Curated annotation (Swiss-Prot):
InterPro entries: IF_conserved (IPR018039), IF_rod_dom (IPR039008), Keratin_I (IPR002957). Residues 94-405 form the IF rod domain. This is Keratin, type I cytoskeletal 19. GO terms for molecular function: structural molecule activity. Residues 263-401 are annotated as: Coil 2. Residues 413-423 have a biased composition (Basic and acidic residues).
Length: 423
């Protein structure tokens, strides 16, 4: 006679597929179920072991695939211990055995239903666990994005302002270079004008010397003319005395040369020559004087215009120097403002980059946590699927063995009645 025992065992599963064995006849029949605590990481798997002992061949199988079976002289093992060749299918307390078998079958079906309920409970707990352990609600980074956009706009505006300042500095530098070029040109022109003025001064000095020389020559000519007049008068007086002393001689002698006429002619000739020389000297003197006066007037006008130009150039130079100093001071102020702005916005940009780095680190951590939870969820779903397959396999096996058992039980009385009829 076969004996049956049923005991409950519990094993803990952390993850991954695990093997289960099913044996009928001197073996064990294990139907697992899964349950998990709320919020926990581990999953407990409880299995019900159905142990039978008896004679006959065993039905062996493994979880996850095929299972082999062999029968010898009836169904022996899982549900019976005397179901072989011999004196019939059942002997002794047949009703007790069948009742025990039916009770065991009902208990197993209850266990199957309990496993299904545990499976549904497990699915509920998995969903709850996923909701608890899953990623929380997405954080609202829109204020940070708005602040970043505002800072970017400020940086862009500051960059544009800096570009404008740099452009103004470049324009001021170009204007200063232009003014410097103009100043150098005007300075060269001033030096040229001063050189011309110095040359005109030398010419004026030369003309003054020439005028002085001419005046000296005129004075010398006047003195020479006075000396000639004096000599002429002396000669005339001497000749007059000679003529008076020779009157008597001339009376007696033959008529000679008319000396008075000769002297008058000589006087006229000398006076004409002197007048001509005087007029020529006066004309030359007047022409030279007028020429010198004209040159002096022209040079004076040029000197006055050059002085006015030099004054204007000095005034322009002073204005340019003042403007250059103001531009240099403005450039220094703008450069200091640019440095302060770059430092301030650089610090703000560094803070924003640090904030972005921390947010990216948090996002990476959240992604890693989500991937880990997703892998755990997939593992649990795989365990659930395998358990469902195992339950379905057990159910099919139970239904097949039950049909074979009842077929054997229904066919055995016919076999036992035939020898009786033969007798």
């Amino acid at each position: 006679m076969a004996t049956y025992s049923f005991r409950q065992t519990t094993s803990s599963v952390a993850g991954g597929p695990c093997g289960r064995s099913l044996r009928l006849g001197g073996g064990s029949f294990r139907a697992p179920s899964i349950h998990g605590g709320s919020g926990g990481r581990g999953v407990s798997v409880s299995s019900a072991r159905f142990v039978s002992s008896g004679l006959g061949s065993g039905l062996g199988g493994g979880y996850g695939g095929a299972f082999s079976s062999s029968f010898s002289a009836g169904f022996g093992g899982g549900y019976g211990g005397g179901l072989g060749s011999g004196d019939g299918l059942l002997s002794g307390n047949e009703k007790t055995t069948m009742q025990n078998l039916n009770d065991r079958l009902a208990s197993y079906l209850d266990k199957v239903r309990a496993l299904e309920e545990a499976n549904s409970d497990l699915e509920t707990k998995i969903r709850e666990w996923y909701l608890k352990q899953g990623p929380g609600p997405a954080r609202d980074y829109s204020p940070y994005y708005k602040a970043i956009e505002d800072l970017r706009d400020q940086i862009l505006a500051a960059t544009i302002d800096n570009s404008k300042v740099v452009l103004q500095i470049d324009n001021a530098r170009l204007a200063a270079d232009d003014f410097k070029t103009k100043f150098e040109t005007e300075q060269a022109l001033r030096m040229s004008v001063e050189a011309d003025i110095n040359g005109l001064r030398r010419v004026l000095d030369e003309l003054t010397l020439a005028r002085t020389d001419l005046e000296l020559q005129i004075e010398n000519l006047k003195e020479e003319l006075a000396y000639l007049k004096k000599n002429h008068e002396e000669e005339m007086s001497a000749l007059g005395g000679q003529v008076a002393s020779q009157v008597s001689v001339e009376v007696d002698s033959a008529p000679g040369i008319d000396l008075s006429k000769i002297l008058a002619d000589m006087r006229d000739q000398y006076e004409h020559m002197a007048e001509k020389n005087r007029k020529d000297a006066e004309a030359w003197f007047h022409s030279k004087t007028e020429e010198l006066n004209r040159e002096l007037a022209v040079n004076t006008e040029q000197l006055q215009s050059s002085k006015s130009e030099v004054t204007d150039l000095r005034r322009t130079l002073q204005g340019l120097e003042i403007e250059l100093q103001s531009q240099l001071s403005m450039k220094g102020a703008l450069e200091s403002t640019l440095a302060d702005t770059e430092g301030r916005y650089g610090a703000q940009l560094a803070q924003i980059q640090d904030m972005i780095g921390s947010i990216e680190a948090q996002l990476a951590e959240l992604r890693a946590d989500m991937e880990r939870q997703n892998s755990e969820y997939k593992m649990l779903m795989d365990i659930k699927t395998r358990l469902e397959q195992e339950i379905a396999t057990y159910r099919q096996l139970l239904e097949g063995q039950e049909s074979q058992l009842f077929g054997s039980l229904s066919g055995s009385p016919d076999k036992r009645d035939k020898p009786a009829d033969g007798k």
